[in-house]
């Protein structure tokens, strides 16, 4: 879910062209991307793509074709996978599980009643990322020569660390949490493209990549990263999902700019609420996160035969379509001036 910082970020978020990321390393929140693919790449009645053995392949389709498109533009990708979540996140994860279970019941009922539009809508909320699916994604990345990092805890924290120390230019996620973890830059809409349907409306909008620079954000708001984290706690994070009643992003900003720290806010209801959350531990999760100390990422040669064997022979992908994508990628790499010919 992440923190709803959008009202504070809209003024500094800049739309970019993917071509501007050529030769730059982008650390992608793997779970965030895979869940996007699982939610959006589905059949006519909302069912996920599967192979002949019943194994879900929607995430592999999205991972392969979107990565090919990005690599063809000379963008260097690193996927960062979640490890064990902080214990404070268990409540949020349990709530997400219940939402998925309810969505599945509504999906099945809509199917039975022939309400296909509703069925497709509910289906998007049922996505589950199982261990074999994560392993399949890692296998595909290895065959594509794309490095991945296994984080010990939150993947976004390790991705942000890579951005902070300069191994990656930016992190990529739909959530804003990377900024709370200290990422120098966050890119949204990197792994999605085209048009997006607005919730509960028959209206589609263009989806364009955007970049948020942490320094610009903090300067524009005249706050520190520590104060940004306190603002997030007031709004509600994955570690205190309820937040504080009646407190949105703009009111939280006003309170922190006035009082500087949560403990100093002279509002009785907030002080009472602070007694029921471990806000210092939440601060530490963001400001002193457990991360993989990545020093270098290694981009390897692509294994075209291995990709065809894995996707086409083992997971029932179209050999013609996979071959076409690989040929397009190879041609783009040949004419690239970025020195990425080592991928082949």
Q: What residues fall within each predicted segment?
A:
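Hydrophobic/aromatic ligand-binding patch that stacks against planar heteroaromatic rings
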Residues: 69, 161-162, 178, 231, ...
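Mobile, glycine-enriched helix-loop/loop "lid" segments at the mouths of ligand-binding/catalytic clefts
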Residues: 187-208
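Glycine-enriched alpha-helix->loop->beta-strand junction motifs that scaffold or abut catalytic
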Residues: 167-169
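Non-catalytic nucleic-acid-binding/docking modules located in mid-to-C-terminal regions
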Residues: 3, 12, 16-22, 37, ...
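Noncatalytic, basic helical substrate-engagement surface that gates or grips nucleic-acid strands
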Residues: 3-12, 20-164, 184-186, 192-193
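Active-site-adjacent pocket scaffolds in enzyme catalytic domains
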Residues: 181-184, 248
């Amino acid at each position: 879910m992440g923190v709803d910082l959008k009202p504070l970020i809209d003024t500094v978020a800049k739309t970019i062209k993917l071509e501007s990321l050529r030769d730059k390393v982008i650390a992608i929140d793997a779970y965030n991307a895979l869940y996007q693919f699982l939610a959006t790449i589905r059949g006519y009645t909302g069912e996920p793509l599967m192979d002949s053995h019943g194994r879900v392949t929607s995430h592999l389709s999205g991972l392969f074709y979107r990565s090919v498109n990005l690599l063809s533009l000379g963008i260097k990708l690193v996927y960062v996978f979640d490890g064990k979540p902080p214990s404070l996140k268990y409540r949020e994860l349990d709530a997400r599980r219940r939402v998925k279970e309810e969505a599945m019941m509504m999906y099945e009922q809509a199917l039975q009643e022939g309400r296909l539009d509703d069925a497709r809508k509910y289906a998007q909320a049922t996505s589950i990322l199982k261990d074999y699916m994560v392993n399949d994604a890692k296998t595909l990345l290895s065959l594509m020569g794309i490095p991945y990092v296994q984080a010990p805890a939150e993947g976004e924290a390790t991705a942000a660390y890579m951005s902070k120390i300069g191994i990656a230019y930016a992190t990529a996620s739909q959530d804003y949490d990377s900024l709370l973890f200290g990422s120098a830059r966050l890119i949204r809409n990197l792994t999605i493209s085209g048009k997006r349907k607005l919730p509960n409306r028959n209206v589609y909008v263009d989806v364009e990549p955007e970049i948020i620079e942490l320094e610009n954000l903090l300067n524009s708001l005249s706050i520190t990263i520590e104060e940004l984290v306190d603002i997030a706690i007031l709004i509600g994070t994955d570690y205190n999902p309820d937040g504080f009643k009646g407190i949105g992003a703009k009111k939280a900003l006003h309170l922190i700019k006035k009082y500087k720290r949560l403990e100093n806010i002279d509002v009785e209801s907030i002080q009472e609420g602070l007694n029921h959350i471990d806000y210092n531990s939440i601060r530490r999760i963001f400001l002193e996160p457990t991360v993989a100390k990545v020093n270098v990422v290694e981009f390897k040669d692509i294994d075209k035969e291995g990709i065809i064997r894995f996707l086409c022979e083992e997971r029932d992908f179209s050999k013609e379509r996979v071959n076409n994508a690989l040929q397009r990628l190879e041609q783009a790499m040949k004419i690239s001036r970025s020195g990425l010919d080592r991928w082949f």
